[in-house]
Regions:
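Ribokinase/PfkB-type carbohydrate-kinase core domain
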Residues: 2-198
Length: 198
């Protein structure tokens, strides 16, 4: 009932290969993801929504083109209609990896309540030289094994909060998760929307 069918478009698919000691590998055909826009969403179906999760905007071409304008429009709409929002992040090796993600996040994070990137994705988006130094330091291994939460992860979380995210949950592989929240004033409306005290 909630699946959008578009005449002449093919279905997208993704397969994720997780190899120990390496970042995940994605096999992906974007299909109709390349043409998906906010206009494709039936807004009537959003009337009772409490949370809108948008997973992997980088595999949806229209979401990162024009500096993330379409993504901003969609997330802003959700916030204006009292819907809590969450979003995943970017695949560094994709076409989307060449987009200016820091500029896109600057536009979009003010409308995102829960931002859930991996530490590598986030570092790639906000600090590419640091990301490259992590890759070099890991020397073919898993970079997250060498990260220090205070000096490597915390600054990224703080940057996301400064850009407007209300809560940031950074996935750090086997070492675990790093969670940072904005101050209570910025998160205040979220409890009323979701019924949870963040």
């Amino acid at each position: 009932d909630g699946i959008i069918a578009v005449q002449g478009e093919r279905t997208s698919y993704s397969a994720v290969i997780a190899v120990p000691g390496a970042d995940r590998i994605f096999l992906h055909d974007p299909g109709c993801n390349d043409t998906f826009t906010f206009a494709d969403i039936d807004q009537k179906k959003l009337e009772d929504a409490v949370l809108f999760h948008f997973g992997y905007p980088p595999i949806m071409k229209k979401m990162y083109e024009r500096g993330g304008e379409e993504l901003e429009i969609m997330m802003k709409y959700m916030k204006e209609h009292g819907i809590a929002t969450s979003m995943d992040a970017v695949d560094a090796d994709s076409e989307a990896g060449r987009a200016d993600w820091e500029a896109i996040l600057k536009r979009v994070l003010p409308y995102v309540d829960f931002f859930v990137p991996s530490v590598e994705e986030l570092c790639f988006m906000l600090d590419r030289p640091r990301y490259e130094s992590w890759q070099k330091r890991a020397d073919g291994g898993d970079p997250v094994e060498f990260l220090d939460p205070e000096t490597d992860v915390r600054p990224l979380a703080e940057r996301c909060i400064a850009l407007g995210a209300k809560m940031v949950l950074i996935k750090c592989g086997a070492p675990g998760l790093y969670y940072k929240t904005a101050d209570t004033g910025q998160r205040g409306a979220l409890a009323a929307i979701t019924g949870i005290d963040p």
